[in-house]
C-alpha cells in the first residue's frame, strides 16, 4: 500500500497532493487533467531544490535532457490534439445541425459525443500554460471549470457510447421495436439524461476543486475531507468502476449479442441496401467504442495501480504517466477522423464543407432565396403588384393604331 495512504504517516504527509520529498504522493484524480500534479513537473520542489539537496534525493525523478524532450513532445502533441479536436468536433456538430439527412438517432448521439470532446480539448491551452509556468495563473473559478469539464467529458463520453451500443443492439436484434424507440426526439432526451447523470460526479468535483499556494507556486487540485488518503482512493475506485468497468461490460454484452445475431441471420430487414447500411453503422460505432477503450484503459489502470502500490519515480515512469494522459485526450480528436473514414454521409458532408462544388453553391443560393421569400412575402407581393401596374399603365398610354 502506498505510504501516503497509510494513516500512520499522516503527520508527515497530510496532503496527498504535496510533491514534497517527505511523502510519495498518489496522483490525484484532478491530475488527469492538471499537469501541476504530475511527476516531474517544473513546479515540483524536488526539481527546484535539487541543487540544494545535492542531487542525492532518490525520490526525485531524474532531470536533464529527457525532461526537456518530454516537455517539447507533450506540448507538440497537445497542440495538435487541441487544434484537430476543436476543428473536427465543431465540424461534426455543424454537419449534423446543417444537413437534415444527418438528423438520425445515431448522429444525435454522435453530436453529444462531439460536444463532450470539444469541451475537453478546449481546456488544453490552460493546462499547457500551467505545465510550462509550473503554476496555475488562472484563478479558482477556472480551476473549478477545467477540472469539472474533464470529469464531465469522461462520464458523458462513456455514457453516450453505452447508449450508442444499446441503440445498435436494439436496431440489430429488435428491428420492430426500434421503429418506435429509435427516434431523434428520444435520442435528445437520452442525451440530456446522460449529462444529468454525469453531474452526479461533475458537480461535486467542481465544489471540491480549489487553488492552493504551496512551495512558491499555485496548485489547482481537489480537496478531500480527512482522512484524505481514504476519500481520494475511494473516488479513484468509484471512477474506475462506474466510468470504465461497468460501461465496458455493458458494451461487450451488447456487441456480443449483435455479433451472434449478425452471424445467424443473413437478412435483417428484407432489403439488401438497408442491411448494408445497418451493418456499416454498426461497424462504425464498434470502431469508435474500441478506440475509446484503447485510449482510456492505460490511464484507468495506471491510476488504480498508483493508488494500491508505490511505484519508483524514474524517467520511464514519468514518460509513461504523461503518455497515458496524452492518450486519453487523443481520443477526443480521433472520433471526427473515424467518422470521415467510416461513414459515407459524414465523408460527403465534410467534403462539401471543405470543397464546395458549384451545384452545392447553387443549392445553397436557391435555398437562401426561398428562405428570403418566405421571410418577406409582402415585399415579393409588392414587387409583383408594381410590375403589374406598370404594364397596365403602358397599355393605357400606348398610342392608338
Swiss-Prot record:
PANTHER family: MU-TYPE OPIOID RECEPTOR, NEUROPEPTIDES RECEPTOR. This is Mu-type opioid receptor. GO terms for biological process: adenylate cyclase-inhibiting G protein-coupled acetylcholine receptor signaling pathway; adenylate cyclase-inhibiting G protein-coupled receptor signaling pathway; G protein-coupled opioid receptor signaling pathway; negative regulation of cytosolic calcium ion concentration; negative regulation of nitric oxide biosynthetic process; negative regulation of Wnt protein secretion; neuropeptide signaling pathway; phospholipase C-activating G protein-coupled receptor signaling pathway. Disulfide bonds join 143-220. The modification Phosphotyrosine is found at residue 169. It is a multi-pass membrane protein. It comes from Sus scrofa (Pig). Phosphorylated. Differentially phosphorylated in basal and agonist-induced conditions. Agonist-mediated phosphorylation modulates receptor internalization. Phosphorylated by GRK2 in a agonist-dependent manner. Phosphorylation at Tyr-169 requires receptor activation, is dependent on non-receptor protein tyrosine kinase Src and results in a decrease in agonist efficacy by reducing G-protein coupling efficiency. Phosphorylated on tyrosine residues; the phosphorylation is involved in agonist-induced G-protein-independent receptor down-regulation. Ubiquitinated. A basal ubiquitination seems not to be related to degradation. Ubiquitination is increased upon formation of OPRM1:OPRD1 oligomers leading to proteasomal degradation; the ubiquitination is diminished by RTP4. CDD domains: 7tmA_Mu_opioid_R. It is found in: Cell membrane; Cell projection, Axon; Perikaryon; Cell projection, Dendrite. Residues 1-69, 133-143, 209-231, 308-315 are extracellular. The chain crosses the membrane at residues 70-94, 108-132, 144-166, 187-208, 232-256, 281-307, 316-339. The gene is OPRM1.
Amino acid at each position: 500500500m502506498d505510504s501516503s495512504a497509510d494513516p500512520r504517516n499522516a503527520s508527515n504527509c497530510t496532503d496527498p497532493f504535496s510533491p514534497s520529498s517527505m511523502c510519495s504522493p498518489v496522483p490525484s484524480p484532478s491530475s488527469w487533467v492538471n499537469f501541476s500534479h504530475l511527476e516531474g513537473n517544473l513546479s515540483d520542489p524536488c526539481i527546484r531544490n535539487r541543487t540544494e539537496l545535492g542531487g542525492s534525493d532518490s525520490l526525485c525523478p531524474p532531470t536533464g535532457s529527457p525532461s526537456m524532450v518530454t516537455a517539447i513532445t507533450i506540448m507538440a502533441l497537445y497542440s495538435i490534439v487541441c487544434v484537430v479536436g476543436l476543428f473536427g468536433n465543431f465540424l461534426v456538430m455543424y454537419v449534423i445541425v446543417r444537413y437534415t439527412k444527418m438528423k438520425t438517432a445515431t448522429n444525435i448521439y454522435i453530436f453529444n459525443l462531439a460536444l463532450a470532446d470539444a469541451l475537453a480539448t478546449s481546456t488544453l491551452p490552460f493546462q499547457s500554460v500551467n505545465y510550462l509556468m509550473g503554476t496555475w495563473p488562472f484563478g479558482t473559478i477556472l480551476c473549478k471549470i477545467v477540472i469539472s469539464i474533464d470529469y464531465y467529458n469522461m462520464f458523458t463520453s462513456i455514457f453516450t457510447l453505452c447508449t450508442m451500443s444499446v441503440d445498435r443492439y436494439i436496431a440489430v436484434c429488435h428491428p420492430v421495436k426500434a421503429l418506435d424507440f429509435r427516434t431523434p426526439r428520444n435520442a435528445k432526451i437520452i442525451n440530456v439524461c446522460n449529462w444529468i447523470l454525469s453531474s452526479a460526479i461533475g458537480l461535486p468535483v467542481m465544489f471540491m476543486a480549489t487553488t492552493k499556494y504551496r512551495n512558491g507556486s499555485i496548485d489547482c487540485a481537489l480537496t478531500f475531507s480527512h482522512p484524505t488518503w481514504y476519500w481520494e482512493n475511494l473516488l479513484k475506485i468509484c471512477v474506475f468502476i462506474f466510468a470504465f468497468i461497468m460501461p465496458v461490460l455493458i458494451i461487450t454484452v451488447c456487441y456480443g449479442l449483435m455479433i451472434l445475431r449478425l452471424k445467424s441471420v443473413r437478412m435483417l430487414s428484407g432489403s439488401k441496401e438497408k442491411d448494408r447500411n445497418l451493418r456499416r453503422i454498426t461497424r462504425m460505432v464498434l470502431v469508435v467504442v474500441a478506440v475509446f477503450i484503447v485510449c482510456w484503459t492505460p490511464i484507468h489502470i495506471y491510476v488504480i495501480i498508483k493508488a494500491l502500490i508505490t511505484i519508483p519515480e524514474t524517467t520511464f515512469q514519468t514518460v509513461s504517466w504523461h503518455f497515458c494522459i496524452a492518450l486519453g485526450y487523443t481520443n477526443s480528436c480521433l472520433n471526427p477522423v473515424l467518422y470521415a473514414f467510416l461513414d459515407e454521409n459524414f465523408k460527403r458532408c465534410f467534403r462539401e464543407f471543405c470543397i464546395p462544388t458549384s451545384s452545392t453553391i447553387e443549392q445553397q443560393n436557391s435555398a437562401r432565396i426561398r428562405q428570403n421569400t418566405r421571410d418577406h412575402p409582402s415585399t415579393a407581393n409588392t414587387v409583383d403588384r408594381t410590375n403589374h401596374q406598370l404594364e397596365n399603365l403602358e397599355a393605357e398610354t400606348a398610342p392608338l393604331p
